[in-house]
């Protein structure tokens, strides 16, 4: 008999709506013992079967659902089916957009909670973020090796969230050849170098692909400020869009060095690109005090909020930084501003921008809205999957 997680009375509603998480407060009891990440059956208070998922005793998310089908076992064949289903969409997208790199698995939205897989050319970069994902590591890798024999697999499960579920951080080659120090990929006509070994997340922010492309329509003959520039994807796109100058700002000299290489790799005019190592908040104030002005500002900061207790402070941070950006824009200038914080809703983010404009003493029009690229889908029953949001704003 399988181990069962029994829900408290009335707490089955989210599972009946096929939400993939069971929170600790919804659990009445466990029937049997399960190890960290082990597959369990989830039943309602009367014992009716609801789902099969992975058990995580140390997490507020006590179980993550693998399947709502009682006949489905969690094995190599299960992972193969999920991977093949996800690949169909990415194949179409890659052909349409001319991509050699994309998100292959977007966790819960692809039916594989806690699993992120990005493909960069012939390298699969894997992140296992939950106890259940780690427990199924061998089955997942076996399925990947069968379906993608041409690809090396590299593990980037070196993220702090693993500690919350009682797991060690892991990183390194799983199978195949070691990735080069910098791997060239292609995106909307750009060549970009990514660092699989040490880069942010899995190496690169694939989720901003379409936003980088959209930037080009606003930048012709314009002076652009690219804040939190990382390795310069927005800068390269701005130069391809015909900007007169782009200033990229980041605290990492290593990232700025790669950004410079990316400009050179695309045979763009390096004299139009400036790279500044500095704190963005500090530099924006310096620019304001000096009377500097820009026509377009890209504001793509890291996540400001990890949990609900940090949300108020994050709102202040987003408002301050966008207020400074609005103050630096010429009349008719464009602010492209983003938040990758899952707890920051699109409505709240829009209100923050409006408040920032009021504090800056400027009127702002919202003219375009952004979200994560199409290889980062959001399944309808898991709205938390929509974490990236952004706006193009025209400053009056």
Swiss-Prot record:
GO cellular component, one term: cytoplasm
Pfam families in alphabetical order: Methyltrans_SAM, PUA_3
Protein species of origin: Shigella flexneri serotype 5b (strain 8401)
Residues covered by the PUA domain: 2-81
Underlying gene: rlmI
Protein family (similarity comment): Belongs to the methyltransferase superfamily. RlmI family.
Catalytic activity: cytidine(1962) in 23S rRNA + S-adenosyl-L-methionine = 5-methylcytidine(1962) in 23S rRNA + S-adenosyl-L-homocysteine + H(+)
Recorded superkingdom: Bacteria
Major location category of this protein: cytoplasm
EC number: 2.1.1.191
Keyword Methyltransferase: yes
MF (Gene Ontology): RNA binding; rRNA (cytosine) methyltransferase activity
Catalytic EC class: transferase
Keywords annotated in UniProt: Cytoplasm, Methyltransferase, RNA-binding, rRNA processing, S-adenosyl-L-methionine, Transferase
InterPro entries (alphabetical): PUA, PUA-like_sf, PUA_sf, RLMI, RlmI-like_PUA, SAM-dep_methyl-trfase, SAM-dependent_MTases_sf
UniProt protein name: Ribosomal RNA large subunit methyltransferase I
Subcellular location: Cytoplasm
Functional description taken from the UniProt entry: Specifically methylates the cytosine at position 1962 (m5C1962) of 23S rRNA.
């Amino acid at each position: 008999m399988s181990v069962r997680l029994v829900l408290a009375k009335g707490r089955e509603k989210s599972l009946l709506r096929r939400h993939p998480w069971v929170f600790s407060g919804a659990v009445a009891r466990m029937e049997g013992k399960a190890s960290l990440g082990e597959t369990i059956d989830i039943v309602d208070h009367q014992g009716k079967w609801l789902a099969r998922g992975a058990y995580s005793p140390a997490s507020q998310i006590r179980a993550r659902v693998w399947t709502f089908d009682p006949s489905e076992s969690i094995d190599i064949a299960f992972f193969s089916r999920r991977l093949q289903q996800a690949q169909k969409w990415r194949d179409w997208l890659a052909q349409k957009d001319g991509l050699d790199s994309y998100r292959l698995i977007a966790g819960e939205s692809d039916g594989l909670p806690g699993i992120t897989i990005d493909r960069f050319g012939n390298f699969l970069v894997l992140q296992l973020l939950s106890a259940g994902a780690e427990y199924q590591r061998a089955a997942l890798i076996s399925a990947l090796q069968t379906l993608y024999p041409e690809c090396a697999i590299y593990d980037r499960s070196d993220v702090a969230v693993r500690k919350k579920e009682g797991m060690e951080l892991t990183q390194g080659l799983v199978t195949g050849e070691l990735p080069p120090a910098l791997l060239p990929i292609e995106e909307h006509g750009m060549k970009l170098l990514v660092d699989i070994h040490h880069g942010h997340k899995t190496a690169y922010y694939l989720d901003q692909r379409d936003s980088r492309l959209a930037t080009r329509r606003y930048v012709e003959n314009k002076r652009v400020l690219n804040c939190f520039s990382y390795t310069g994807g927005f800068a390269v796109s701005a130069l391809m869009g015909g900007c007169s100058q782009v200033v990229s700002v980041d605290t990492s000299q290593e990232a700025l060095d790669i950004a410079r290489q990316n400009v050179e790799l695309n045979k763009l005019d390096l004299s139009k690109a400036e790279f500044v190592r500095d704190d963005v908040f500090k530099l924006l104030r310096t620019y304001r005090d000096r009377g500097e002005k820009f026509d377009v500002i890209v504001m793509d900061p890291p996540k400001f909020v990890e949990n609900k207790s940090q949300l108020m402070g994050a709102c202040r941070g987003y408002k301050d930084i966008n207020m400074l950006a609005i103050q630096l824009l010429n009349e008719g200038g464009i602010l492209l501003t983003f938040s990758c914080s899952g707890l920051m809703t699109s409505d709240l983010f829009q209100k923050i921008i409006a408040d920032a404009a009021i504090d800056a003493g400027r009127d702002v029009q919202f003219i375009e809205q952004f979200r994560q690229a199409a290889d980062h889908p959001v399944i309808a029953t898991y709205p938390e999957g929509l974490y990236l949001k952004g706006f193009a704003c025209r400053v009056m």
